[in-house]
């Protein structure tokens, strides 16, 4: 339990920030799943478009430090490899 005004405020901020970060992580997972689904469908052009959109999302979330930049790079690399293998 927070005892000072500052600690109470930081606790409130932490709850709000946690909710926002959780939402952003969910957006990331949705973007990755969308690319995987497009790749499984077998349409390379559609998958490439979804991939470009998801790369933007992944980079934006990494820039905000919600995920580590290396994790973002790993996601992008694996999705790109899967897209390339679709040929």
UniProtKB/Swiss-Prot annotation:
GO biological process terms on file: translation
InterPro entries: Ribosomal_bS20 (IPR002583), Ribosomal_bS20_sf (IPR036510)
Source domain of life: Bacteria
Name of this protein: Small ribosomal subunit protein bS20
A GO CC term attached to the entry: cytosol
Gene Ontology MF annotations: small ribosomal subunit rRNA binding; structural constituent of ribosome
Organismal lineage: Bacteria, Pseudomonadati, Pseudomonadota, Betaproteobacteria, Burkholderiales
Polar residues bias (residue ranges): 20-29
Alphabetical UniProt keywords: Ribonucleoprotein, Ribosomal protein, RNA-binding, rRNA-binding
Family: Belongs to the bacterial ribosomal protein bS20 family.
Function: Binds directly to 16S ribosomal RNA.
Extent of the signal sequence: none
SUPFAM superfamilies, A to Z: Ribosomal protein S20
Pfam families (UniProt xref): Ribosomal_S20p
Region (Disordered): 1-29
NCBIfam families: S20
Statement: the UniProt record of this protein carries the keyword RNA-binding: yes
């Amino acid at each position: 339990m927070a005892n000072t005004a500052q600690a109470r405020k930081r606790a409130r901020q932490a709850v709000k920030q946690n909710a926002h970060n959780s939402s952003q992580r969910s957006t990331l997972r949705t973007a990755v799943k969308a690319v995987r689904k497009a790749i499984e469908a077998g349409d390379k052009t559609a998958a490439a478009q979804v991939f470009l959109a998801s790369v933007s999302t992944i980079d934006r979330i990494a820039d905000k430090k919600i995920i580590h930049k290396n994790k973002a790079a790993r996601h992008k690399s694996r999705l790109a490899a899967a897209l390339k293998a679709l040929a």
